[in-house]
């Protein structure tokens, strides 16, 4: 029974895998942008109230993302409203994803990664 289930899961995985061909078409969004369009990178995290954990995880990931996309405006948002509220009492302001998207739209960004 376990072998059959494992075989089925493997077949589904192979069938659904993205690859260059079939249903997947590689494209460079930034290369296809028209004059006047702007792109930004929005990193969304659950969040943490622990400063040391944030430095070792979220800030490290954000630094790698900034390095990978140096030409894009960088923003971050947290999904946990509890974390956002607790950080705000300590003077650390984080946006929700909706707030970040609305702010980017207000600033004229047309493409968000």
Question: Predicted regions: what is each one?
Answer:
Residues 18-113:
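Active-site-proximal alpha-helix that buttresses catalytic centers in soluble enzyme cores
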Residues 1-7:
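Positively charged n-region of N-terminal signal peptides that target proteins for export
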């Amino acid at each position: 029974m376990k072998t059959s289930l494992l075989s089925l899961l493997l077949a589904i995985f192979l069938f659904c895998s993205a690859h260059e061909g079939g249903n997947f078409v590689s494209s460079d969004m930034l290369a296809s942008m028209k004059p006047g369009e702007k792109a930004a990178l929005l990193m969304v995290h659950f969040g943490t109230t622990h400063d040391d954990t944030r430095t070792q995880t979220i800030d490290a990931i954000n630094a790698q993302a900034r390095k990978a996309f140096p030409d894009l405006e960088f923003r971050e948002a947290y999904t946990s409203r509890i974390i956002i509220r607790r950080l705000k009492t300590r003077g650390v302001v984080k946006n929700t994803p909706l707030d970040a998207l609305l702010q980017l739209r207000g600033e004229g960004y047309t493409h968000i990664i």
